[in-house]
């Protein structure tokens, strides 16, 4: 008997308050790391009704104009009028950044250029064959819809849309393989004079339909919920407070694999919450691309101030084409998962982070992220004899 189930993932637009916070934190990180690649940055952002608070810890010789950076991010997102729920010109911006603890710094910066993990913790990476970019289909579809929502708003195709929005996609699986889209939920902020029918028609025809047309999957029997509450005028930080690091499942795999709990945005790459999660994706994707397995979950864990991982775990979910112990040995032999090894191999001391802060950190091959490369495939095949 076939094993059937429905799995759901969500995404949010760049104008969602939590994503606004992520983008501000990462824009500050980019500004600093471009001028001081050895900086230590832990930047958190809070957004609420008409104001923004920037907090955290820094160790850098660079000066960052926090107010200007934050306002420019908000402007780029599209909050250019107080009627939208936030205005980049009039919002108050409070800077509460402090200096990094010397106790943490001693453990991170070690002799000989080695870098200890910035904290203890566990991180996960994942890859599967559901899409060409080796990502789970539900989160891939959800991100595609939210990106399209922003695109048609910004290019004027649907001028009455506003920046805040969300999408959720439920996919039917049979024996572990996606076979049909079951339900799509979209909630989007809009101008107050627009009717629900106008919003529903525009979102279906200009956003959802073009996205679905790019996927080879059954779309014949989808249930649609577009602005199911009927009205979404008050949005952005006026509707809900936003905070860095509150969309960690949106940022990763949509719930398709475990999450270690550490957020990404605002953290320089000595923080293994971020860099090791990128490395884990890199490893998992290369294992699947090499044909070692069809699906891979990788866990890596660290102790603060210690460079080498305390554990590496690989789960192929029964899809391995070779002994799993050999796969673990392959990972340990071919991938340097120390913080310095990750930073060097993935070239992470660059201002690349704001681009990651909306629409997911993984599966976005068009952005040129180093952890999405499959340049270890030949080495893996040679090691495993594939």
Curated annotation (Swiss-Prot):
Cofactor: record remark: Binds 2 divalent ions per subunit.
Positions that bind L-methionine: 57, 100, 240, 271
Stored InterPro entries: ADOMET_SYNTHASE_CS, S-AdoMet_synt_C, S-AdoMet_synt_central, S-AdoMet_synt_N, S-AdoMet_synthetase, S-AdoMet_synthetase_sfam
Positions bound to K(+): 44
Origin: domain of life: Bacteria
Keyword Phosphoprotein assigned: no
EC primary class: transferase
A single BP term in Gene Ontology: S-adenosylmethionine biosynthetic process
Residues given in the record as Mg(2+) binding sites: 18
Binding site for ATP: 16, 164-166, 231-232, 240, 246-247, 263, 267
Keywords: ATP-binding, Cytoplasm, Magnesium, Metal-binding, Nucleotide-binding, One-carbon metabolism, Potassium, Transferase
Subcellular location: Cytoplasm
Primary location: cytoplasm
Cofactor requirements of the protein: Mg(2+); K(+)
Entry-linked HAMAP family: S_AdoMet_synth1
Biological role: Catalyzes the formation of S-adenosylmethionine (AdoMet) from methionine and ATP. The overall synthetic reaction is composed of two sequential steps, AdoMet formation and the subsequent tripolyphosphate hydrolysis which occurs prior to release of AdoMet from the enzyme.
Protein name per the record: S-adenosylmethionine synthase
Organism expressing this protein natively: Sulfurovum sp. (strain NBC37-1)
